[in-house]
Amino acid sequence: MSQIDKMAKIKKLREISDAPFVDCKKALENSDYDIDLAINWLNKSGKSKALKKSDRIAAEGLVLAKKDPNSVLVFELNSETDFVAKNQNFINLQQKIGELLLANDFTNLEDALLIQDEAGRPISELLILATATIGEKITLRRVFKTKYSLEQSVEVYTHSNGQIAVITILKGGNLEIAKNISMHVAALNPQYILKIEVPNEKLQEIQLEVEKKAFAEVKNFEKKPENVKAGILKGMIDKQLSEFVLELQPLATDSAITVEKYLAQNSATLEKVVRFEVGEGIQKQNVDFSAEVNQQIQEFQKK
């Protein structure tokens, strides 16, 4: 290999890893000038700045739901800032990872990270490369994938801003029904899918609260027949539950009927609903910009 070719390789590795010139040169010399092997060498030796970003919090990013004739998938790809999430390199990476995840079988996130692209690079390495190239920590945080049959109606919905993605699997029904449910779940974010999923303790709390409210607000409630009381209480309880139970909620596209009735009218039953929203459950780091600038000034003055 000519000296010019070697310098070109060093330049390329520097652009990818953001590591110093000397370290890039050493990495390539120890890797027979193979870029991928050199990246691994830098990561193992801790010279790559991508590795030094690994302890940062990545709570922004994008989610995406995809399907093919056999499987359906939803996953979350994170960055440190929403600005980077709009970067075309980040968007391209998300699309590539989505294709790899959909085309390959895996049982958990750890297995998913081992899936290789056409060049033999695992997803974990693609994330390291993206971290070095983009300049922020990039992570594949979570993924859900399942197979489905012809008897099921499966549809996906990813909100236009890429912050919310939903998959819906129905027994019976059709794709339009599944799509409407996915859009409903994206908008209202119900905590539970079915009433029977609500914990008994929570149900008992609601029942006691509703009974007190009925005696206080419903005229002559205590004098009404037991069957009338039961009907009033059920209606009040269901109304409160509809704030967080999918099947009891008025359908987002037609508030005249509940999701439960909408499904029944179309001979469909809910089998699985999965909703991902970017950053949910992550404790975001609050950065004091002024303090950060002052710290950098102090460090500079010490030099």
UniProtKB/Swiss-Prot annotation:
Q: Name one Pfam family in it.
A: EF_TS
For this UniProt record, the keywords arranged alphabetically read as follows: Cytoplasm, Elongation factor, Protein biosynthesis
Give the GO cellular component terms, alphabetically: cytoplasm
Query: Is DNA damage one of the keywords UniProt gives this record?
Result: no
Disulfide-bond pairs as recorded: none
- Note the HAMAP family from the entry: EF_Ts
- Give the protein's function: Associates with the EF-Tu.GDP complex and induces the exchange of GDP to GTP. It remains bound to the aminoacyl-tRNA.EF-Tu.GTP complex up to the GTP hydrolysis stage on the ribosome.
The record's comment on protein family reads: Belongs to the EF-Ts family.
Its recorded name reads Elongation factor Ts
**Origin species:** Mesomycoplasma hyopneumoniae (strain J / ATCC 25934 / NCTC 10110)
